Amino acid sequence: MGSYIPSTGEERQAMLQAIGLTSTDQLFDVVPESVRVKSLDLPEGLSELEVGQKMAELAAKNRVFPSVFRGAGAYRHYIPSIVKTVTSKEEFLTAYTPYQAEISQGVLQSIFEYQTQMCELTGMDVSNASVYDGAVAAAEAVFMCQERKRSAVVVSGAADPQTIAVIKTYCESREVPVIVVPADGCATDPAAIQAALDGATAAVYVQSPNYYGVLEDMDAIVAATHAAGAKVIMGVNPISLGLLKTPGEYGVDIAVGEGQPLGMPLSFGGPYLGFMTCKKAMMRKLPGRIVGETKDDDGNRCFVMTLQAREQHIRREKASSNICSNEALCAMTASVYLAAMGPKGLRQAAESSAAHAHYLAGELAKLGFGLCSGDKPFFHEFLTDSPKIGRASCRERV
């Protein structure tokens, strides 16, 4: 019997005889007759040609929109063909990461390279091997900032509503106070953030570009937060970092975001990638896996899972988080994308996205659709008001 060829009828009969049975049905005698499925009443199978025709018939009922402009956290960018070619190789596309991870040096090296690239991209010191998505990354970052006398988190109301909802869900079980500061128009007011800070505040979460596409005043927000003794978590679009200042340049403590724009298709919502990078001082609070570089007994360069005392297979329920191995493939997808694009390619993608968005905003303005954000700077998406609806109503509906 070949690796992927099912057993023949003769082979199945021989196996039944070996255990003293005459039919496959006898294997299920222990299942009560009343709950057994008598028949599925399925039609005859179709040929390959007939299946293709049936699928074409169903697809013809769809309304296809080649251009997707929805944005709001998931973006359709150009993906070099080499990304799928590399990530589809059987050496990487496996069912599971071995428990003895060090035998998979290729996988560990790909994770290490991903971590290195994310640190360079965000300007931070340390990266983990990723988490499930950007919202989870934000919620995990909140827990990283928890201290004995500081637990509350202040969240910008201009952040992605789904991210805010996930943060609230995570914090509810631990009774962590979540204070949402309403957006001032389409942006965050640094003075409002400052007013919400007190001695119990552990962290402030701000997204820039925010949900409305506006670039926040991160310098003022970081200064106010650090002056109050709290930490800053910045949610960021990774494509924007090809053009804009990095979280590290702003002086934030933790940078998180949705990694889907880095080579992952929309795929009806997943699987996506949550990236997390932080300052070295917070490294031991970083959730998920971290791969480090070392040398073996012969002095050869090799890679290992490091700082494992934080993880679930050692600390169990006290672990900082629980992350599955599927994320390694998504992380490698981002790594291959960044390698294929290079610094110039990433900057070109960012500049092209920003230029097209600003061109569209200008053309819509000629038709009477103004920007809800007024003259505030934005990156590659924006919210318009409608001449018939009004600016406030547009924001409310979004």
Residue ranges with predicted function:
Residues 262-367, 371-375, 379:
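Active-site C-terminal subdomain of aminotransferase-like
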Residues 1-39:
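Compact, charge-rich alpha-helical regulatory domains located at protein termini
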Residues 89-101, 117-123, 149-150, 171-179, ...:
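Gly-rich Lys/Arg/Thr-decorated short loops/hinges at beta-loop-alpha junctions or inter-strand turns
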Residues 15, 136-304, 368-369, 391:
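Conserved PLP-enzyme active-site core in the AAT-like
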Residues 99-103, 119-139:
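Short loop-beta-helix segment that forms the pyridoxal 5′-phosphate
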